[in-house]
């Protein structure tokens, strides 16, 4: 069996063209299908909502941070695909003792392209992966380069958590023309006083993981009257697979 190196610099022995794949990451599930691998995908998480209806046809092996190891064992996977941030490492450590586990570690669009290329290599779909990367690259090239203004992007309500540097969302915010005012890396907690002091032009409330709604817009708008507060599609800012094809069109449609 050939050896491959994943994005955590782990060398994995993976069979040529694996036939029983489990995806532990929603964006990668969609990517695998778009690479033509739906028939070889046997297991996914309860959060793998795209493509619609796929969960009814496949085995749900739990969530991204709680795996049902008995269900995984019953599927007899010859490849499991995960992510450093989205999956819990204790579970990954147990899985990699029994199965080939390929992990991604993504902070930028370039990392996402490397991941797509890597999955193409380990699944025998390199040509399809290259076409997808080319399509996304071409689309991104037409993204307006103008600055929209300063922004804070929230992913959680209580405690209030924002997106900082060293995250994929931070990279995509910059590509969308936003200047992220949050300087602390990863996902720092903020207070309302912090938000008022930052005084962003835009307060972006993500649809996931916390499901911000119109009532939250109203709450923040009352506290930050000079800031334009709006809901944004978290999938379009945080999913780093084939959904990137829709990023430019979505961003250009934002108010």
Label the predicted regions:
Residues 1-255:
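N-terminal ligand-binding lobe of clamshell/alpha-beta domains
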């Amino acid at each position: 069996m050939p050896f491959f190196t994943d994005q955590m610099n782990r060398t994995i022995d993976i069979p040529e063209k694996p036939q029983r794949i489990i995806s532990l990451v929603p964006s990668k599930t969609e990517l695998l299908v778009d690479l033509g691998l739906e028939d070889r995908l046997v297991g996914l998480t309860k959060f793998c909502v795209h493509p619609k209806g796929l969960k009814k046809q496949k085995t749900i092996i739990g969530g991204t941070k709680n795996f049902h190891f008995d269900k995984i064992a019953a599927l007899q996977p010859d490849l499991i695909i995960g992510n450093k941030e989205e999956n819990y490492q204790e579970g990954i450590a147990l899985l990699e003792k029994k199965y080939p586990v390929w992990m991604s570690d993504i902070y930028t669009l370039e990392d996402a392209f490397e991941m797509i290329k890597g999955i193409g290599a380990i699944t025998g779909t390199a040509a399809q992966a290259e076409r997808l990367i080319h399509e996304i690259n071409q689309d991104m090239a037409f993204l307006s380069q103008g600055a929209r203004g300063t922004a804070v992007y929230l992913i959680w309500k209580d405690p209030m958590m924002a997106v900082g540097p060293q995250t994929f969302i931070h990279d995509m915010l910059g590509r969308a023309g936003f200047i992220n005012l949050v300087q602390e890396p990863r996902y720092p907690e903020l207070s309302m006083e912090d938000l008022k002091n930052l005084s962003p032009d835009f307060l972006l409330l993500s649809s996931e993981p916390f499901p911000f709604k119109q009532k939250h817009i109203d709450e923040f708008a009352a506290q930050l009257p000079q800031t334009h507060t709006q809901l944004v599609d978290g999938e379009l800012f945080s999913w780093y697979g084939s959904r990137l094809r829709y990023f430019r069109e979505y961003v250009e449609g934002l108010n």
